[in-house]
Amino acid sequence: VDFSILRDYQSIKLNRNIKAGKIAVADLNGDGIYDYIIRTPEKNVDPGMPGTLDGSTYQIEAYLSDGTFLWSKDLGQGIEPGVWYSPFIAYDFNGDGKAEIALKTAPETTQRNEKGRVDSGEEYLSVWDGMTGKEIARVDWPERNDRYGNLVRQNRNQIGMAYLDGKTPYILACRGTYKLMTVDAWQLKDNKLERAWRWDGDEENPVVRSMGSHNMVCGDVDEDGKDEILLGSCMLDETGLYYGLPD
């Protein structure tokens, strides 16, 4: 008896003999079937833990639904191997029927300090072509500053997607959870990232701090056809307007 026909999962062979960490699914080639974007290895260093001194890095790999290997890219020393340092998401952001990958990146020249940490240097929001891994667009990630607190609090990064106008997928780049919180909303248009708005919790009256969580949830809460953004105990509407618990 061939029991393989009874399984409710897909099995593919990875390009390297290494365990996968996080996986995103999206249609990379436009055939209507989900493909796989995999971040390896499964290692995870939290900002509150000691840094890694072994020089290990994350790689992003892409596979078609049938297991065909497409490409692999190393994120380099500028991205520490931890989920807070390396958020990524896959979606069709430009409406061409094929998904792109949006993620946090850093220059190849960035180096870690003697504690295995990255405490300075540029950081980017990059968009890669799903079939080739080639970078399509790049802008600055929300920058570090002392208002976030120490490095443990500065290095809390998340990424998401929301239909802010009800029809266009916007990329959301978020920094901060336990003190200052900021969010940038970007649209991929003509192979360029255009910023729609930035929300900065310190610009609210009173200021909004330490209200985040370990995820960012987007959805149409008020049923106006446009997505809102839920960050822990606070919510942003499609224009970046803040709503708190009393609202």
Short names for language-model regions:
Residues 1-247:
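Beta-propeller-forming repeat regions
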